[in-house]
Amino acid sequence: MNELIKHKLELLPDSPGCYLHKDKAGTIIYVGKAKNLRNRVRSYFRGSHDTKTELLVSEIADFEFIVTGSNTEALLLEINLIQENMPKYNIKLKDDKSYPFIKITNEPFPRLLITRQIKKNDGLYFGPYPDAYTATEVKKLLDRIFPFKKCKNPVNKVCFYYHLGQCQAHTICHTDKAYWDSLVADVKQFLNGKDDKIIDDLRSKMLEASHNQEFERAAEYRDLISGIATMRTKQRVMSKDLQDRDIFGYFVDKGWMCVQVFFVRQGKLIQRDVNMFPYYNEAEEDFLTYVGQFYSDQRHLIPKEVFIPETIDETLVAAIVPARIVKPQRGEKKQLVALATKNARVSLQQKFDLLEKDLRKTSGAIEHLGQLLGIEKPVRIEAFDNSNIQGTSPVAAMVVFVDGKPSKKDYRKFKIKTVIGPDDYASMREVIYRRYSRVKHEGLQAPDLIIVDGGQGQVKAARDVIEHQLGLSIPVAGLQKNDKHQTHELLFGNPLAVVELPRNSEEFFLLHRIQDEVHRFAITFHRQVRSKNAFSSKLDHIAGLGPKRKQLLLKRFKSMAALEQASLEEIQQLGIPKTVAEALIDHLTSKSDT
């Protein structure tokens, strides 16, 4: 068991779901389901196993998991993932049988059937169910509640089920289509979970039978109510309409965004895509950018439908994706988006938890890093990153790692003061000069290594300030990212060259951790500054509202949206005169009306 698996095992949730074991090449070699992901996945790496399982475990290099809402959902998702990926260690289902559905026929006098064959425009289908037994039990319950036609006898003859109170076909006029439409609508609502009315009716009948001392009949109604409660579990990972669709969910935290895409094909959730990256603008804006890039990749075929979270403007998505864009508002479809969002949150949290837990891996990394660079052991490392959007609200940030661990009390933020426009090199020169002129003249502790986020230009700018302007002797290295915003390579030396670092080494992990942390700190600060500037600029030109009062408003209301909802009294409570508060409200009202 490698270190990655050890740490990921500690972060597994106590939730139902599916897990996917992978080999060194990243190929899925086994798919399983679990009522409790934590307990099930851990069991592979504890205790003894039979020969077959030992062989499987010996090939596991990594694993992923998908959280579901119930064990039934996990079972159904497992079926789809196995059929889609055909992992070599999974037992193939005999004859590759499909799974049972309950069908309401399109006949003039509809019947309830169990079928494994789905044909378009041939009736209504509900399911799939994990096995024939489950489907049969649900149908039995429906037969006892809804008096559909049960056999192929002519409707003018009484059948056996009539005597059981389970068929009324012969008593209904041939032309009374409204009755059957109403019955079908009731079953649809029932199977979609809207069963409160039926339960209320059954409960009333149970109480009436009990009152009349018809205890056997009362027990039948009680059993029906119990049966309904048993089958209330929704199967959200399946879709009954056989539609191809992609389902997007996203979650943001600490300057990072995780997007999960569920691929539903022929009504089955067969695969997912997970991507995590730092975001720079508003979350909704960067999500839209991601969606555009996602479908520009020819590997991602555009389905008929795309489901998106309700916070996203569907008209903007429709402008870049030629598909039907849906923001589900209720029911199963909304729950699917919620499930994708939940998995995005879990994945992002796992990333952060892994980073924290893996700090233990850095114990020997500092010394090895010093040896690789040919410098003394870099006990104290200071790292810098710039953040701006086309030169607006430019800022920079510095994080400090001591003995391989973040020293947050030493973190620093910088607002760029002398640079106009988007000039990363000039911004880096300014920040490095401001920081290390203080180190030089105020006797502050100097680092053993400076790391800048960027390539040769940033490194040369920083080194020029350190060596020529300040006359200091502090090594400077650069960390470059790849096109996926992942730590890619370390630059060092004179002339600058790439330092070869194994991707699985402790030194590489330490640098990756530092780069992630300084980037997170920088963009979080940038977002705060940009939000504050936007808030203040919208309040310009209001007489009597200077910087201090704007600061009070920002501290109290946090956003323009909240301020626009504030009352005159709430604004005055901050010590703002009534005339100024009234002018502010008038200004906000006129802005919202335009």
UniProtKB/Swiss-Prot annotation:
GO annotation, cellular component aspect: cytoplasm; excinuclease repair complex
UniProt-listed Pfam families: GIY-YIG (PF01541), HHH_5 (PF14520), UVR (PF02151), UvrC_RNaseH (PF22920), UvrC_RNaseH_dom (PF08459)
Location in the cell: Cytoplasm
Domain GIY-YIG as annotated: residue spans: 14-91
Keyword field contains DNA repair: yes
Domain of life of the source: Bacteria
InterPro entries found in the cross-reference section: GIY-YIG_endonuc, GIY-YIG_endonuc_sf, GIY-YIG_UvrC_Cho, RuvA_2-like, UVR_dom, UVR_dom_sf, UvrABC_protein_C, UvrC
Keyword Ribonucleoprotein: no
GO biological process: nucleotide-excision repair; SOS response
Main location, first listed in the record: cytoplasm
A GO MF label: DNA binding
Residues passing through the membrane, by range: none
Residues of the UVR domain: 196-231
Keywords assigned by UniProt, alphabetized: Cytoplasm, DNA damage, DNA excision, DNA repair, Excision nuclease, SOS response
Family statement drawn from the similarity comment of this UniProt entry: Belongs to the UvrC family.
PANTHER family attached to this UniProt entry: UVRABC SYSTEM PROTEIN C, UVRC/OXIDOREDUCTASE
Known role: The UvrABC repair system catalyzes the recognition and processing of DNA lesions. UvrC both incises the 5' and 3' sides of the lesion. The N-terminal half is responsible for the 3' incision and the C-terminal half is responsible for the 5' incision.
Complex and partners: Interacts with UvrB in an incision complex.
Protein name as catalogued: UvrABC system protein C
